[in-house]
Amino acid sequence: MDSLSSSTTTASAQRCLFVTLGCAKNEVDTDRMRSLLIDAGYGVADDVDSADVVLINTCSFLASATSESIDTTLDLADEVSAGVRKKPIVMCGCVPSRYGDDLDEQLPEVAAFVKADEEDGIVAVVDSVLGNAGREGRADLTGTLRTIEGTSAFVKISEGCDRFCAFCAIPYIRGRYKSREEQEILDEVSSLMEGGVREIVLIGQDTGIWGSDFGDGRNLAYLLRGVAEVVRPYDGWVRVLYLQPEGMTDELVGVIRDVPEVLPYIDIPIQHCCERVLKSMGRSGSEEQLRQLFARLRSEIPGMVLRTTGLVGFPGETEEEFEALLDFFKEQEFDYMSVFPYSREDGTKAATMEEQVPEDVKMDRAQRLLDVAEELGFSATAKHVGERVKVIIDGVDDSDDGVELIGHTWFQAPDCDGAVHIESGEATVGDVVTVDLVDSFCYELVGEIVDGE
């Protein structure tokens, strides 16, 4: 069997396989690590067989995500051990951040652990596990480090969270809230647009409070104006995810309404509408305050699209409170809704609360709310039939009979809200084309390219 590495093997000949689990924020972190390693002279592998080292970026937001991360790591270890050549596994991200030193004994299959806030040191870690420590060709951390794959790019504008919601482990995994520096964000956006990206999606745990820790008055509205200026020469789009009700200031609403590059797509994960449940969750607001907020947004931004999230089965949630959430979803007719059953997470305040809702009740409530969400979402999608919209071409699907183009329009967040399927017409990936929407199915739309536009 081959040795782990030999003294004659150069880093430029060694390749890294990247496996990413979890949310878009993890995708961004993986992208940065990949860029650092490429900059340092490593290559990228497509599978375990062709890799010299395997890096798995893990998620630990929920117990189920932690289990998936560990199971995937063990599956990769089995695949590695079945090969003709040993290769190390490096576990990165949320699981090492959450469980720390406990993993050394529990996962002897893993050669190294890299916490979420240590990922800029990934080159030194890979050098070490491959026996390349001390070599020349270190990565440069001063530039904009992103690889460009696809027509849309997620850009993190912050790290961590200060909310400490009773159900959420993120502050314990990712730390306290910290805004990313404005110029660093703008430089990254510029690099991505120059590389052919058409849409920038700004993300963070709580995007609406960007800049609040700077103490100089800069805020998300200010940042959006700056990002819009960067994407404007490219006819690019800007989308913001993970806003909170308290962050929807008049200034921010005005920017979303008045700056053409900023899409009128608002993602506000409310979790619940009942004041008692929200207070128990460690969140603020009430059903009436949320009702007033959405009425204001719809009035000030005509035609806007709303996405939200519902969390059911939180400790102490009664059937009446769940029914109130169900009715609120029906009343508000959100365009897109994600639904989650409460997960009891170690280390969170809610994990020690009494009146834990039985698992079967949680799952039943989640399914009932999901049924409503899908009914409303399918209806909202169908209402767009007959519209003429701009569509970014994201790819080509030739899996069925014939070939169709796949894209998304302004009211569809990438990898989230469905797509536009175009069965005729010519375009290439990255093109922005004018499309007539002629049909819908579930969250998907069917369109026809308008010639000459």
Q: What kind of region is each of these model predictions?
A:
Residues L21, F164, C168-G175, W237-E246, ...:
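Conserved strand-turn element in the central/C-terminal portion of the radical SAM core barrel
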Residues G215-G226, D250-P264, E317-F334, E359-D364, ...:
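Short, electropositive alpha-helical surface patch
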Residues E194, A221-D235, T249-T308:
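Radical SAM/AdoMet-radical enzyme domain recognition
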Residues T352-E453:
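Terminal RNA-binding accessory module
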Residues S60-A65, V197-V230, L243-E251, L278, ...:
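Conserved glycine-rich "GG(E/T)P / GGGxP" loop and the immediately following alpha-helix
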Residues V19, I203-Q205, L241-L243, P269-Q271, ...:
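Generic beta-strand/beta-sheet core signal
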Residues C165, I185, L202, V240, ...:
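Conserved, mostly hydrophobic/aromatic
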Residues M1-W210, E251, V262, I266, ...:
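Proteins enriched for Cys/Gly/acidic motifs involved in redox and nucleic-acid/cofactor modification
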